[in-house]
């Protein structure tokens, strides 16, 4: 029983129903969307789910009568806000990076997110990240009082292209020497049996996190650029992640900027990542300070901190990189014409230094109508910071009415 006396419903019984009737599918969609975005309005539910207002209203009314939904009208707003009633369940999102694993978790009936991250060495191999991720999930749920036995879904973002049809990894990030074969969800079965595991590229999930909870909220087309050790992107069109046929959508780091340029680990030459990847930026700082300073930054994060404190070399290297990224973004804009570009990853932690030179690069080659109109494409910093991927994984897994297995 809940504190109000109503019978508490297990969220899994609402989501894991076998019926594929139109009515039951729509019911699950509405429940999932309300869990993913607590307090969403009925108007937004219809828009996000591509359902009619009448269909959403009927489903919400039925769920309200059952005590599963609470519906409130707030002054000055269009549409009633929908929140869960006495429903018990936990949603989890995981992001695996080159140097860090992050986990976000929360109850499905609240927007309060618990978050934890840990250092992780990618050279530990492709087998350790599943174990470390599972351990971090368990630690976070214990520390915060969340019931691990009531997890309804786990979204997992990894630095790899993932085939959206099978959840199989098609290619790991060029900077990682990982051999990931087989089904990624299956790797989690020893730790979380019977829990749906929804796997995708970590930049895709970061894009979805900003779209659902952050800087991209309310935008129709959002391009998220993750600039850290490597460079990736995620594209949201009409609330959906664009992945492409084989999961390679968003590989902005491998746009060819110079056909005769530096060899890239992907096998090509002159990729954007060879010009603005973390290793290249650190090398430029080392070259600039050769013979002058020994206490050089060892990470992009360290470069950013020095630039913020006034280090002219770090600032110049970072701003030159931002301008180059802007040049590449002009190509993407000319093809996709996004409404909003969000800068995330490590470089997203210094918007005050990098957004302007990035926009300068974009303006050079983007079509005039996109940058000079009354409603130009905008570049903004991330609202969610380094938590974007884990939070997006959490939200997307809740929204997904399926488990993809190999």
Feature roles, as predicted:
Residues 219-276:
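Glycine-rich phosphate-binding loop of actin/hexokinase-like ATP-binding domains
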Residues 87-89, 194-195, 217-222, 231, ...:
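Short coil/turn connectors at secondary-structure junctions
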Residues 116-221, 353-364:
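Glycine-rich phosphate-binding loop and adjoining helix at the ATP-binding site
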Residues 71-72, 196-201, 235:
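General beta-strand structural signal in soluble alpha/beta enzymes
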Residues 184-186, 243, 250-257, 362-372:
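Acidic-glycine-rich active-site phosphate/pyrophosphate-binding loop
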Residues 112-113, 169, 241-242:
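Hydrophobic "anchor" residues
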Residues 107, 164, 236:
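Short, acidic, Ser/Thr-enriched surface-loop or helix-capping motifs
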Residues 1-76, 83-150, 260, 268, ...:
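ATP-binding/phosphotransfer module of carbohydrate and carboxylate kinases, centering on a glycine-rich
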């Amino acid at each position: 029983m809940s504190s109000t006396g109503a019978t508490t419903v297990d969220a899994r019984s609402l989501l894991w129903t076998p019926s594929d009737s139109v009515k039951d599918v729509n019911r699950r969609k509405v429940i999932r969307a309300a869990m993913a975005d607590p307090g969403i309005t009925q108007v937004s539910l219809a828009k996000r789910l591509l359902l009619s207002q009448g269909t959403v209203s009927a489903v919400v009314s039925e769920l309200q009568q059952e005590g599963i939904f609470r519906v409130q009208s707030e002054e000055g707003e269009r549409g009633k806000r929908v929140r869960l009633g006495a429903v018990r369940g936990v949603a989890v999102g995981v992001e695996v990076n080159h140097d860090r694993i992050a986990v976000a978790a929360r109850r499905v009936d609240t927007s309060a997110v618990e978050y934890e991250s840990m250092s992780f060495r990618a050279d530990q191999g492709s087998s350790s990240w599943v174990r470390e991720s599972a351990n971090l999930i368990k630690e976070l749920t214990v520390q915060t009082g969340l019931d691990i036995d009531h997890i309804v879904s786990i979204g997992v973002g990894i630095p790899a292209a993932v085939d959206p049809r099978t959840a199989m990894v098609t290619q790991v990030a060029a900077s990682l020497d990982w051999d990931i074969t087989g089904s990624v969800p299956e790797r989690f079965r020893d730790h979380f049996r019977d829990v749906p595991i929804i796997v995708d590229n970590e930049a895709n999930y970061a894009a979805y996190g900003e779209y659902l909870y952050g800087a991209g909220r309310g935008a129709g087309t959002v391009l998220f650029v993750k600039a850290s050790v490597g460079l990736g992107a995620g594209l949201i069109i009409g609330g959906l992640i664009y992945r492409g046929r084989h999961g390679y959508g968003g590989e902005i780091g491998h746009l060819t900027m110079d056909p005769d340029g530096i060899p890239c680990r992907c096998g090509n030459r002159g990729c954007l990542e060879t010009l603005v990847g973390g290793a290249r930026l650190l090398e430029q700082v080392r070259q600039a300070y050769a013979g002058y300073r020994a206490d050089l930054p060892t990470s992009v994060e360290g470069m950013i901190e020095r630039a913020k404190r006034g280090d002219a070399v770090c600032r110049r290297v970072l701003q030159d990189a931002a301008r180059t990224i802007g040049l590449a973004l002009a190509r993407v804009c000319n093809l996709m014409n996004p409404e909003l570009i969000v800068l995330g990853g490590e470089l997203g932690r210094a918007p005050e230094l990098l957004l302007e030179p990035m926009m300068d690069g974009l303006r050079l080659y983007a079509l005039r109508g996109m940058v000079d109109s009354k409603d130009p494409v905008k570049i903004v910093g991330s609202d969610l910071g380094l938590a974007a991927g884990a939070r997006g994984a959490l939200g997307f897994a809740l929204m997904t009415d399926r488990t993809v297995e190999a």
